[in-house]
Amino acid sequence: MASFQCDIVSAEKAIFSGSAEQLIAAGVSGDLGILRGHAPLLTELKPGPVRVMREGGEEEVYYVTGGFLEVQPDVVSVLADTATRAHDLDEAAAEEARQEALKAMGDKQSDLDYTRAAAELAEAVAQLRTIQQLREKGSRR
């Protein structure tokens, strides 16, 4: 399979730069699969996993809190708000954040509090989904 240059960067640092055969990311309108030669594209990403399939079948999974995906003929760039390796996610902390967000949504003091709690809930659920996908990938090997 043909490859392309893939870069995943956040405001803090570059987290990945290398050759990839495929990239799958969570766009605001659904998951996107990118291969070499994909039509140029600029789209917003929602919190969730970004999966990079390297040459030889190796897969690397990252978690982004949102950002943008830019596709050019030979280069794909993920410009993330924040990004981390999926292996570095803390499942217990994500579950605790999910529980706190649910509680805050129930105890809403204002629309702003509810909106903030809903955003925190979406991020915690996305982290848990990323961890689950990583776990499922590991059990298939």
From Swiss-Prot:
Belongs to the ATPase epsilon chain family. It is a peripheral membrane protein. Pfam families: ATP-synt_DE, ATP-synt_DE_N. This is ATP synthase epsilon chain. InterPro entries: ATP_F1_dsu/esu_C_sf (IPR036794), ATP_synth_F1_dsu/esu (IPR001469), ATP_synth_F1_dsu/esu_N (IPR020546), ATP_synth_F1_esu_C (IPR020547), ATPsynth_dsu/esu_N (IPR036771). The lineage of its organism: Bacteria, Pseudomonadati, Pseudomonadota, Gammaproteobacteria, Oceanospirillales. F-type ATPases have 2 components, CF(1) - the catalytic core - and CF(0) - the membrane proton channel. CF(1) has five subunits: alpha(3), beta(3), gamma(1), delta(1), epsilon(1). CF(0) has three main subunits: a, b and c. Produces ATP from ADP in the presence of a proton gradient across the membrane. GO terms for cellular component: plasma membrane; proton-transporting ATP synthase complex. Keywords: ATP synthesis, Cell inner membrane, Cell membrane, CF(1), Hydrogen ion transport, Ion transport, Membrane, Transport. It is found in: Cell inner membrane. It comes from Chromohalobacter salexigens (strain ATCC BAA-138 / DSM 3043 / CIP 106854 / NCIMB 13768 / 1H11). One of its GO terms (molecular function) is proton-transporting ATP synthase activity, rotational mechanism.
